[in-house]
Amino acid sequence: MNYNSINLVKTHLMNYPCPLNINFLWNYGFLLGIIFFIQILTGVFLASRYSPEISYAYYSIQHILRELWSGWCFRYMHATGASLVFFLTYLHILRGLNYSYLYLPLSWISGLIIFALFIVTAFIGYVLPWGQMSYWGATVITNLLSGIPALVIWLCGGYTVSDPTIKRFFVLHFILPFVALCIVFIHIFFLHLHGSTNPLGYDTALKIPFYPNLLSLDVKGFNNILILFLIQSIFGVIPLSHPDNAIIVNTYVTPLQIVPEWYFLPFYAMLKTIPSKNAGLVIVVASLQLLFLLAEQRNLTTIIQFKMVFSAREYSVPIIWFMCSFYALLWIGCQLPQDIFILYGRLFIILFFSSGLFALVHYKRTHYDYSSQANI
């Protein structure tokens, strides 16, 4: 048994063959794993001192920040880690849109399931501090889900956000990261089953073992991201949270603008610019489903027989517009709901879906074999 375990570790962590020409864009998965582990570790420590009750939730957070030894450090590391997880996830998806989704459909789908779990976990975690923005954000989202029969009552324990809501959210926020961790192992299994991609976009025989060659590249990236992580956690260089969330809940006073965390802003822009809440919910779900459909591109192209040629390095024009429209929605999500921003939001939603659907059309790939130039 011990021999098999050692052999498994050597096969998948040391001798795993990787393409010779991969670069820092392939670091994001490793960095995500490290930051996600830090999130679980700090979350377990915070959960041991948190009280999931309306009367004590806000004060338990203040107790952790002000009275526990290094409690403020764990609290801000957990908050910064959430932003960093989504930042790295978006970069990881960005790299996958250019290099991986067509070749590794199983890894792509499992990764998107992890992304969906991250979204749910982060949202319910945003409610737990029980600040002013947490309460009203939870109220808006749960009202949005009222179009689904009985879901709000089951999720909130009543018709409004109340004490049963925060208890259920706390349990889900504690359990879902471990569910995501299990799917991470499945994601790695599918990746190792087919092998990693590379910037040239096709399989090559020029491969080297993961250890020590590419591990040193991952460690270098980890050192850089760790410095940024600690600086942000300790000094708070970039204000990531809304100041209204430092105010205790007042159910009779609405904030000037209900704004979620920055990593939810693209989806919030879709909800804000669509007048019907049910239509907005459908648009948000469809935006995630569109990413899942990209894994079916090979099957769809057997039906749509329409091909295009872009370039040797395969920077697809629809994918570029797809990404630009997503980041434009991120900017629109933090703006006040004025007419001009609502108009821009609707235009970028149309561009987002049209470019994403256009990317589903397979294009002919033109590659140049550079392996003959390598003296190996």
UniProtKB/Swiss-Prot annotation:
GO terms for cellular component: mitochondrial inner membrane. Its main location: mitochondrion. Its cofactor is heme b. GO terms for biological process: mitochondrial electron transport, ubiquinol to cytochrome c. It is found in: Mitochondrion inner membrane. A ubiquinone binds at residue 192. GO terms for molecular function: metal ion binding; ubiquinol-cytochrome-c reductase activity. It comes from the Eukaryota. Component of the ubiquinol-cytochrome c reductase complex (complex III or cytochrome b-c1 complex) that is part of the mitochondrial respiratory chain. The b-c1 complex mediates electron transfer from ubiquinol to cytochrome c. Contributes to the generation of a proton gradient across the mitochondrial membrane that is then used for ATP synthesis. PANTHER family: CYTOCHROME B. Heme 1 (or BL or b562) is low-potential and absorbs at about 562 nm, and heme 2 (or BH or b566) is high-potential and absorbs at about 566 nm. This is Cytochrome b. It comes from Plasmodium chabaudi. The lineage of its organism: Eukaryota, Sar, Alveolata, Apicomplexa, Aconoidasida. The gene is MT-CYB.
